[in-house]
């Protein structure tokens, strides 16, 4: 089988995660600045057998969409143009940042590493992807 690439899209940065070939386990990749996102995706898709994208769906506790969703829709439109043969799926990302912070806090990392926003973003992407993979 092939791999799935997950993206936790943010205003400044995007966290990435990738699945194994069996599409059963999610692994964190990197967090990149938004200005580098398309080049990063290009590099990943050239070096890995990606067949699907999973992009976080930012909802509030009351199930409303965050304003960031408008920006994400533009991002998805560009991804569809650049990768017309790859599937694009959405996954609810409610509480992923909070869960990522909790997981990091329970780790053996030093405090400065635990507060690293880039680490939180890529762990959030991993949580989004693992949630998606459980449904396959």
Language model regions located:
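Phosphate- and other anionic-substrate recognition elements at nucleic-acid/protein interfaces
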Residues: 2-7, 11-12, 17-136
């Amino acid at each position: 089988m092939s791999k799935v690439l997950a993206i936790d899209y943010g205003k400044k940065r995007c966290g990435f995660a990738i699945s194994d070939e069996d599409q059963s386990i999610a692994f964190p990749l990197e967090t990149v600045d938004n200005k580098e996102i398309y080049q990063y995706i290009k590099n990943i898709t050239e070096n890995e057998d990606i067949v699907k994208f999973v992009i976080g769906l930012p909802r509030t506790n009351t199930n409303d969409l965050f304003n960031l969703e408008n920006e994400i829709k533009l991002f998805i439109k560009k991804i569809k143009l650049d990768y017309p043969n790859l599937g694009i799926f959405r996954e609810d990302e409610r509480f992923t940042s909070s869960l990522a912070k909790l997981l990091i806090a329970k780790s053996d990392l030093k405090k400065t590493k635990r507060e690293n926003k880039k680490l939180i973003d890529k762990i959030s992407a991993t949580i989004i992807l693992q949630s998606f993979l459980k449904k396959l």
